[in-house]
């Protein structure tokens, strides 16, 4: 619904800005999102080519910064060809957690105002997940980050908690310490 790929059966889905302005979610609002799903979304090619899917003219410095934010730089820089290492479709040649971190780095590099992480840290251990979330808060202070998770530990980085139940979204906590 948030990406305008499906629409509610009744009512409407809107984005509400800090100033109260409402924008109805549609295919046109999709460009405001960087989306990282649970499964691998990497393509056959180099790591750099995968990152540049988000920002075609990304510099080495920008890619390095995004990889560091996603806790991927340490393993990418240790590969024989670094960001020029070839991977296969769906991140073949990498662990699932490594592929998730590269997908997160790609989303960071895109720089959209809303980052949607849909179980995007599910293959990470708790320590790495916590560091990725801390890094995102630091590196993207003006980006709205929407996190869907089944892991309670990730919730401590959220300023608002919502519960989806019976087709409704309900705010259950606001202004939690990050």
What residue spans do the PLM features occupy?
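A short, proline-enriched helix->beta-strand linker immediately N-terminal to the Walker B motif
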Residues: 109-113, 142
